[in-house]
Amino acid sequence: MAKDKKVEISLEEKLKKALVPVDEQPYKIPNNWVWTRLGEVNEIITGNTPSKNENIFWENKDIFFVKPDDLSQGRHLSFSKECIDKRAIKKVRMLPKNTTLICCIGSIGKVAYSEVESCSNQQINSLIAKENCVYPLYNYYLVNSVFFQSQMLENSSATTISILNKSSTEKLFFPLPPLNEQKRIVEKLDFLFEKTKRAKEIIEEIKIDIENRKISILDRAFKGVLTFKWRNENKTSDTKELLKSINEKKLKKWEEECLQAEKDGNKKPKKPIIKEVKDMIVPVDEQPYKLPDSWVWVRLGEVVEVNPNKIKIDIGENELVDFIPMKNVSESSPKIIEKNFEKFKDLQKGYTQFIKNDILFAKITPCMENGKTAIISDLKEKIGYGSTEFHILRSTKIINNKLLYNFLKQKGFREDARYNMTGSVGFRRVPTEFMKSYPFPLPPLEEQQEIVRILDEVLENENKVKELLELEERIDVLEKSILNKAFKGELGTQNSNDEPAIELLKEIL
């Protein structure tokens, strides 16, 4: 009897240690659940890496060697990019299938559920559910919840790289329901998350379809296909006459600058180079494709001012002017996301100047590849300023700036721009000369306006990506809400006939 009494006391002490005191419990759970610690109901294993100096450990691909990047497989981890030889098996800590793997260094909280035997590197802590206490998939879903993710971040070390060590992992709060309810929770979550997964897949398919259609529409626009019927029914001005007018405008602008220089007592500016129309047209052997007869191939720099000189303007130094940082330029719309204002005196040096109707084109990676481009509309003053990582394109009267905007949004143009970038990794930029020399298919002015009208109409129906992104965000919020309810016992999975969870703890203790 004395021996039995001693066992009973020992069990009570173990229970007391395993259970979370009421005043420390994160939130209220059903009466037949208990709050315990992760390490009480799971074996936690930190991975390790066999020596890279031992070639035999890496010779054959016998055993999956999981690293953080592999965790992107989520609910169904079935392979790893890297494997080890079976001769290294004594040098690693093997993980059975149905293990939940968590990144504990760097991208803390990234999680996957393994459907295969594997091992992992030291950046991963793995949870092996204790038999007849925790249903393995319950671990996976719990770790994905906002509650558990927050715990991990709060308990990680505040160093240059966040680290959640094994000891801290073991102490994390764990809401333990009866075993049968764990299974019902998992079944319901599997069902609901299969629905949200399918919804996300459909959204992704639609996004790809929309993007492909936009690419096709823009391609047809700049080959004259969109306006084929219109062209046959309407007379247009001569495009070559448009090019002639460029020279007239250059000379007029130069004369105005000369008068201003004389007035200011400055040296006259250099006379602009005047080209014959035939010299403005791209040679036939350099033309990317055949255009309609009324169109011509020109270099972008012939019809657009690329990074024009700053304009002198009489503004008080403390006057506020428009300021546009890179983050305020949209990847999908010509409109500025948000207007900022700064004092004129703070922007005169070290920033890029622009005026109304200029186009801002992000020249640095990855902003350029992401499509950051905008048309400047209203300005508080006659000028504004922005990041030095913009190319400024100023349309002349022979080119519609919205047509130019759509040209710059083409996938093909951006791929060419990316290929011609210069600079070191992370700081690669599109050179000014690339912008100036790029071939541009110039239609007659009237046809430009018709192309813009058609594109506005068609692309308005195609620009649904923003709405889809908002829908994706709502699905993400829904998933978080579902998990939140699941681990509070609010998913309708309870059964009063279930054996209380405390009995599970007693069995394993």
Question: What is the meaning of each model-derived region?
Answer:
Residues T49-N53, L71-C83, K97-N121, N125, ...:
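Short, ligand-facing micro-motifs at secondary-structure edges
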Residues S51-E59, E154-S156, F228-K235, E257-K263, ...:
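Short coil/turn segments at secondary-structure boundaries
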Residues D23, G39-E54, D69-K97, E115, ...:
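Sequence-specific dsDNA recognition surfaces
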Residues V20, C104, S118-S126, P136-L137, ...:
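A short glycine-rich beta-alpha junction/loop motif
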